[in-house]
Each structure stands twice: as C-alpha cells, then as structure tokens.
Amino acid sequence: MLYRSLIALIAFLAMVPAAMAAEWEEGTHYRTLSEPVETRSGDQLELAEVFWYGCPSCYSMQPVIEEWKETKPDDVNLRHVPASLRRDWAPHAKAFYAARQLGVVDGIHSELFDALAGERRDLNDVDAIAAFFEEQGVAEASEVRDAWGSFAVDTAMRRGRQFQQGAKVTGTPTLVVEGKYVISVRAAGSYENMLAIADHLLEKERSGD
C-alpha cells in the first residue's frame, strides 16, 4: 500500500510542471513578437525587466524580482531596461544609465525606487538627481553630471528606446524574454505569475521547443 502511494505521489509531482506550463497560453498570458528585439546578454538567456522608478507597480514588484534572483538559473541574465515611454520619465531612465556608467547601480537602484515611487520626491532633472546620488554617498554630483552627458549614456538611452519600441511596450512593469516574448502584469494577473511565465518561456528557449 505504501509502495503504491509513493508511486502515485511521484507520478503526481512529475505532472505538476507540465500542468503549470499548460496554464500559460500565448495570446492570453503573454504575446510573441513577430520580429524579435535585440538581446544584450551574450551567451546567456535574457530576461529584460522594463521599469520606471516612479511606477508604484514596479516598486511593488521589486521584492518579487529580488526573491526570483536568489534562485535564478546561472544561464539567465536579468537585464534592467528603464522605460522612457513619456518625456517626463526620461530623466529617471538617464539616472539608471548614469549609475551604470559609474558602476553604482547596486548602491542606488532601490534608493531611486524609494525616493520616486515611495516618497514621490521631485527628482526630475540632472541637478536634483546628481544631488541625490551625492546624498546617498554613491558618487559626487560632478561625476553624475559628467556621466549624464556622456556618449555612452546617450547611446544607452537610444538603445533602450529602440528596445521598448521594438517590443511594443506600452506600460510598466513589463518582462521581455529572450527578445521574443512580452509579459505584462495585466495579462499575467500578478507579479508572481509574470515570473512563473518567464521561467516557463526560458525553459522553452532552453529546450529549443
């Protein structure tokens, strides 16, 4: 009796991943791009997170993203793409790229979310953002201004816009898997579902299905 129960349990557990995968339907929970967008993760699979620092939903999703990162497969790169869907979002996108240019993303990413989405601080131009970086102790204001006006940051902004346009991103947060599949929170139903669908699609790419 115990043996048969154990066999039944093993069979059930084997069916769980397939059943979960069957729940995620193309056109309902995610969409496939007719023309894939460029990935920038080398030999790794790419999960791109399109976000805006002032977005309450993106802010709420961050703990879910952080938890996912703890068990992220080694062959997957999480790429951050700051949204510039509106003109007033552009300074915040540029803040991310300036931070990346200075090598201080890890020291300012959460703090920018706290300030813009959490506290609704008025950080809408280079002077305010440079002062904020200095306030957080991650860079001198002059360093931020230099990075802000650099060719590298301008190029990153242009590529980010091209990525968003190519993926037909209309809101945040949005996930783009391997430049091919687009997942919105509205379609997925929750932040946790977004990442579950992303994991399903990453496995699909990994297996070549």
Predicted regions and their residues:
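Extracytoplasmic thiol/disulfide redox context detector
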Residues: 2-87, 161, 166, 202-209
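Solvent-exposed, acidic/flexible segments
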Residues: 43-44, 54-61, 85-92, 101-105, ...
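A short alpha-helix capping/helix-coil boundary motif
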Residues: 45-46, 73-76, 107-111, 138-141, ...
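Short, contiguous strand/loop micro-motifs
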Residues: 52, 82-83, 116-117, 147-148, ...
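Sec/Tat-exported extracytoplasmic proteins
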Residues: 54, 69-72, 99-103, 112, ...
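Extracytoplasmic/secreted envelope proteins and their assembly/folding machinery
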Residues: 62-69, 92-96, 109, 126, ...
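Structural microenvironment flanking redox-active thiols in thiol-disulfide oxidoreductases
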Residues: 73-102, 107-133
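C-terminal cap of thioredoxin/glutaredoxin-like
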Residues: 135-209
